C-alpha cells in the first residue's frame, strides 16, 4: 500500500521512482524534478533516501540550495559533489545565497577548498572563485570574515 501510494504521487508529479527489495529505503531517481514535488515525496514517504543522486550527480540538497529551501537538509551530506564536483556550497556561492552559505557550515574541508589548501579539487574553481566571478561580494566578504575568525 505504501509503495502504491508513493507510485501514484510520483506519477501525478512526473517523477521516476525505483524501489529496493527490502522496502525500508525508497530510492527516488531525480531527473528534472520540481523541488516542491520533491518535498511532497519526502514528506509523504519517510523512508526516502536524502543523499541519492540524479544522473548528473545532483542531490536534493543541491536543488534545495538553488531555491533557498532548507527543508530537505536534515541528514543530507553537505560535502557531496555533483558530476563536476560542485557541492551545495558552490551552488549557494554562485547564486549569492548568503543564508544557504552560512547554513552549509564552515567545515575544515570547506575552508580548505576556499583557499585551495590541502585539497585536490575536481574543479579548477572553488566556490569562492565562483562567487567572485558572479559578482557575489556578500559571499566573498562573508567567506573572508569566516576564514579570519577561524584562524
Curated annotation (Swiss-Prot):
InterPro entries on file: Ankyrin_rpt, Ankyrin_rpt-contain_sf, Multifunctional_ANK_Repeat
Pfam families: Ank_2 (PF12796)
Note, other: Iso and Leu residues are assigned by comparison with orthologs.
Domain notes: The H8 helix is predicted to insert into membranes and form pores by assembling into tetramers. The helix is contained within a helical bundle domain that undergoes significant conformational changes during pore formation to allow exposure of the H8 transmembrane helix and transition of the toxin from a soluble monomer to a transmembrane tetramer.
Domain of life: Eukaryota
Organism for this UniProt entry: Latrodectus hasselti (Redback spider)
Matching PANTHER family: ANKYRIN REPEAT-CONTAINING (PTHR24123), PROTEIN HOS4 (PTHR24123:SF33)
Gene Ontology cellular component list: extracellular region; host cell presynaptic membrane; membrane; other organism cell membrane
ANK repeats: 21-37, 41-52, 56-80, 84-104, 105-116, 117-125, 126-146, 147-151
Lineage: Eukaryota, Metazoa, Ecdysozoa, Arthropoda, Chelicerata
Protein name per UniProt: Alpha-latroinsectotoxin-Lh1a
Major localization class: secreted
Amino acid at each position: 500500500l505504501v509503495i502504491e501510494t508513493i507510485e501514484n504521487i510520483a506519477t501525478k508529479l512526473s517523477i521516476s521512482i525505483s524501489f529496493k527489495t527490502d522496502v525500508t529505503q525508497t530510492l527516488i531517481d531525480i531527473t528534472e524534478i520540481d523541488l516542491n514535488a520533491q518535498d511532497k515525496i519526502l514528506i509523504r514517504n519517510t523512508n526516502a533516501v536524502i543523499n541519492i543522486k540524479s544522473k548528473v550527480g545532483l542531490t536534493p540538497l543541491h536543488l534545495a540550495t538553488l531555491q533557498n529551501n532548507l527543508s530537505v537538509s536534515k541528514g543530507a551530506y553537505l560535502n557531496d559533489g555533483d558530476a563536476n564536483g560542485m557541492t551545495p556550497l558552490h551552488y549557494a556561492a554562485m547564486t549569492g545565497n548568503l543564508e544557504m552559505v552560512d547554513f552549509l557550515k564552515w567545515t575544515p574541508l570547506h575552508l580548505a577548498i576556499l583557499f585551495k589548501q590541502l585539497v585536490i579539487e575536481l574543479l579548477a574553481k572553488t566556490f569562492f572563485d565562483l562567487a567572485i566571478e558572479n559578482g557575489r561580494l556578500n559571499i566573498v566578504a562573508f567567506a573572508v570574515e569566516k576564514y579570519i575568525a577561524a584562524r
